[in-house]
Amino acid sequence: MSKILKIQYLKLYNVISCFLWMSVLLRTGLIWGITKDTAVVFHETNTLVRWVQTLAIAEVFHSIFGLVSSSPLTTIIQVASRLYLVWGVCYPFSYVIEGSPIYLSMIIAWSITEIIRYAFYAFNLNGDIPAFLTWLRYNTFLILYPIGAGSEFLLVLKSRIAAQYVWSLNKLLWPILMSIYPPGLYIMYTHMLAQRRKISKRAAARRT
């Protein structure tokens, strides 16, 4: 793939992904604003969120085949954990998840994070990142990541409780997932902290 074609493809991917997550956030906000009912929000957004998140599988291949500089390990951890949430928790255990405000907090945290991330990547490919977007990218995760990760963990816990009463693959996967999940979250958070320090050093160097 030529460099120009690669850049154009990645721009298109990031712009589309940004707008898809904007649609998730807008839909979530509108439905919650009208109904104030988390069950309605879940039923009206669950399918959209599931497929928008599934699209991120492409990012694993982007990293593996060198289209982007992201580490395949961190990309796989991030995408796999999200896919587990949408397909392994929210989909089969919708009857447990639908009334929980935790789902709402998770989707809001995910949406804002992804809108900022994809917009940042798109502008970066264009060679001109607005300063405010750089600030958002490397500061909002300090709040949004714990909210999102905490919500994810609580939803996984709710599904685990429900899985006790029915046969579920979650029963078999639970010990493995719980041994991988905490270190995976730690790796992702410390990776972002390292990126934040790197950007801060660059900004300080430009000012001197």
UniProtKB/Swiss-Prot annotation:
Q: State its Enzyme Commission number(s).
A: 4.2.1.134
Q: Where is the active site?
A: 145, 152
Give the pathway annotation: Lipid metabolism; fatty acid biosynthesis
Q: What does the record say about its membrane topology?
A: Multi-pass membrane protein
The record ties this protein, via Pfam families, to: PTPLA
Going by the record, the broad EC class of this enzyme is: lyase
Q: Which InterPro entries match?
A: Tyr_Pase-like_PTPLA (IPR007482)
Official protein name in the record: Probable very-long-chain (3R)-3-hydroxyacyl-CoA dehydratase
- Source organism: Schizosaccharomyces pombe (strain 972 / ATCC 24843) (Fission yeast)
Which lineage do the record's taxonomy fields give for this organism? Eukaryota, Fungi, Dikarya, Ascomycota, Taphrinomycotina
